Regions:
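Hydrophobic alpha-helical membrane segments, chiefly transmembrane helices and signal peptide h-regions
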Residues: 39-46, 150, 243-246
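Active-site-adjacent alpha-helix of alpha/beta-hydrolase-fold enzymes
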Residues: 84-91, 195-211, 215-217
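Active-site catalytic motif of lipid deacylating hydrolases and related acyltransferases
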Residues: 57-135, 215-242, 246, 251-260
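Secretory targeting and sorting signals
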Residues: 1-55
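Short conserved micro-motifs at the rims of enzyme active sites and ligand-binding pockets
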Residues: 1, 193-194, 224-228
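Serine-dependent carboxylesterase/thioesterase catalytic core
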Residues: 117-207
Length: 264
């Protein structure tokens, strides 16, 4: 859940020692993880915090989504595709679906992703307190998937010092308010270690594991140890994975609502 505070100078604060994967491969992976975001960003349709019809009250569903690196503020291209497809799911017909864009830099400075962990965690806690009947869908793409994954963590990994603003994992009782978690192109632990050896592994917590869909295109070098196609990292909307995740999330939202009704 937490990102270590220990960093080096401005230039290696994100990348660390790239020699472990070779200069040529490092260049191509950087291009996949970051430069590719520029074309994905062109798909963005909604600014952060854009109000919906249910903005003054409590929506039936709220999507809390963290965009990928270099994408402008909002939910990003992959996030918008996921939201659009979620809203078309038949199980959610007639339901008010709001969107909250996680507020964080989404920059080359990976330790600053802690800002996103704090913001997303605070949003989930706030919604759970103010709107206990709202079903939340937590998600993220690329660096944003790391943010969302850290939010679900059960504990602070041994040896990691949490940055200011993070005191520990979310309380267990919050988990029942999060119906689904959707991750796209989540950085693998091997990728994290190759670019920032201070970053803790991304482990989805036990309370969230069964309601998490972790989408990784096999050729995506960011999430797949055997991936080698840089373009695959930005193909989640085109290859059907956002649609698949939307169907999964809608089913989980519906199931959570049924459980809540039965328990009353």
């Amino acid at each position: 859940m937490q990102l270590a505070e220990t960093v080096h100078d401005h230039h290696d604060v994100f990348w660390g020692d790239m020699s472990v994967i070779g200069c040529g491969q490092a260049h191509h992976i950087r291009h996949a993880f970051f430069a590719g975001m520029l074309s994905v960003a062109a798909l963005v349709l909604a600014p952060p915090g854009a109000p919906t019809a249910a903005a003054e009250g409590c929506p039936d569903v709220e999507v809390v989504f963290a965009r990928g690196t270099f994408e402008p503020p909002g939910v990003g291209g992959i996030g918008q595709a996921f939201v659009d497809q979620l809203k078309t799911q038949p199980q959610l017909a007639g339901k008010a679906v709001d969107v909250y864009a996680v507020n964080y830099p989404a920059s080359l400075n990976f330790p600053a992703a802690a800002d996103g962990v704090i913001d997303a965690s605070n949003r989930v806690r706030d919604m759970a307190a103010r709107c206990p009947d709202t079903k939340m869908v937590l998600g993220g793409y690329s660096q944003g998937a790391a943010v969302a994954g850290y939010v679900t963590a059960d504990k602070i990994p041994d040896g990691y010092i949490p940055p200011n603003g993070i005191n520990g994992p979310m309380p267990p009782e919050i988990a029942k308010h999060v119906a689904a978690v959707a991750l796209f192109g989540k950085p693998s632990n091997g990728f994290l270690n190759s670019i920032d050896r201070t970053a803790p592994p991304i482990t989805v917590g036990g309370l969230y594991a069964a309601k998490t869909i972790d989408q990784c295109i096999p050729d995506d070098p960011i999430c797949s140890p055997t991936g080698s196609d840089n373009g695959a990292h930005q193909a989640y909307a085109d290859d059907g994975m956002t649609a698949q995740a939307a169907a999964f999330a809608a089913q989980k939202v519906t199931s959570a609502a049924v459980v809540d009704t039965a328990s009353r």
